[in-house]
Amino acid sequence: MSKVDNIEQKVIKIIADNQGKKIEEISVDLRFAEDLGVDSLSTVEIMMEIEKEFGVDVPDEEATKIKKVADVVNYIKEHKS
């Protein structure tokens, strides 16, 4: 399994756990608000968990640009040390 696949799987698991969904229900194409029904509080919780899991800092101005699951995966790939 590649590093990217591993990041993607972890991100999907975090979102699924937060939203009470099955992992199979989440894909990188989905949008947080429109497709998954993630509200602003849940978005903050998800981003805090992402920061903790991957050791990355996601400033608020960057977090507001994240609209899809793929955006999270790409952000981690770009900023993970």
From Swiss-Prot:
**SUPFAM superfamilies according to UniProt:** ACP-like
Domain named Carrier is located at 2-80
Tell me where in or outside the cell this protein is found. Cytoplasm
Q: How is it modified after translation?
A: 4'-phosphopantetheine is transferred from CoA to a specific serine of apo-ACP by AcpS. This modification is essential for activity because fatty acids are bound in thioester linkage to the sulfhydryl of the prosthetic group.
Pfam families from the UniProt entry: PP-binding
Q: In which pathway does it act?
A: Lipid metabolism; fatty acid biosynthesis
O-(pantetheine 4'-phosphoryl)serine modified-residue sites: 40
- GO MF terms held by the record: acyl binding; acyl carrier activity
> Where does this protein chiefly localize?
cytoplasm
One GO cellular component term of this record is: cytoplasm
Q: Which keywords are on file for this protein?
A: Cytoplasm, Fatty acid biosynthesis, Fatty acid metabolism, Lipid biosynthesis, Lipid metabolism, Phosphopantetheine, Phosphoprotein
Which domain of life does this protein belong to?
Answer: Bacteria
Described by its record, this protein's role is as follows: Carrier of the growing fatty acid chain in fatty acid biosynthesis.
Q: Which family does it belong to?
A: Belongs to the acyl carrier protein (ACP) family.
Q: Which PANTHER family does the UniProt entry name for this protein?
A: ACYL CARRIER PROTEIN, CARRIER DOMAIN-CONTAINING PROTEIN
Q: What is this protein called?
A: Acyl carrier protein
Gene that produces this protein:
acpP
